């Protein structure tokens, strides 16, 4: 019940940003409409609900976003930073079976981090929650990932520090188009498109 109350409050605050309304860019509109807020009941959702147990509703919602993003991006690699379960891996691989899974943990050395970021390949997805030494990790990602990559930053509204950091990333010269989904932020590194930041009622 508490989840639904919080979700409703967030929805009310962002109601004017629903479904891509008011977005001028055709590409951004399609991404919001058909990836972020796509409500089509993919047949795999039911299978994944049975396969992935023990996660809360918000995590399930984000997992489904990762599924759709993987289906859209068709990433060569999904680099998962500080995973606490295999749920994101399972949903990403369901969205794109060819995706190679890699992870960064507390035990991963700096040398290995650089190697992983440098070798992810084109159109890859990188998940970074704002925990541990996230600033250093994001900086390495921005320096070494190919421009076709997309980074998902989780916990961007956790506290004022996280919100301020997200604002920094949106303005960073190394980032391209970004989407503030409240529960997470999505950053594309392709700078061929006009840089813009969108707030989306996800």
Q: What is each stretch, according to the model?
A:
Residues 1-147, 157-202:
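A short alpha-helical cap/connector motif
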């Amino acid at each position: 019940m508490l989840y639904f109350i919080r979700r409703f409050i967030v929805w009310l605050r962002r109601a004017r940003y629903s479904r891509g309304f008011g977005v001028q860019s055709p590409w951004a509109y399609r991404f919001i409409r058909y990836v972020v807020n796509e409500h089509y009941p993919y047949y795999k959702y039911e299978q994944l609900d049975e396969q992935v147990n023990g996660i809360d509703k918000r995590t399930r919602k984000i997992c489904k976003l990762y599924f759709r993003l993987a289906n859209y991006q068709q990433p060569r690699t999904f680099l998962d930073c500080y995973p606490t379960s295999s749920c994101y891996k399972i949903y990403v691989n369901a969205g794109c079976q060819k995706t190679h899974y890699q992870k960064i943990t507390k035990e991963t050395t700096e040398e290995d981090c650089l190697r992983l970021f440098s070798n992810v390949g084109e159109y890859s997805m990188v998940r970074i929650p704002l925990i541990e030494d996230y600033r250093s990790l994001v900086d390495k990602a921005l320096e070494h990932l190919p421009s076709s990559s997309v980074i998902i930053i989780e916990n961007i509204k956790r506290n004022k520090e996280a919100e301020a950091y997200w604002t920094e990333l949106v303005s960073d010269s190394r980032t391209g188009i970004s989407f503030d989904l409240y529960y997470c932020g999505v950053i594309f590194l392709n700078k061929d498109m006009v840089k813009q930041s969108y707030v989306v009622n996800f």
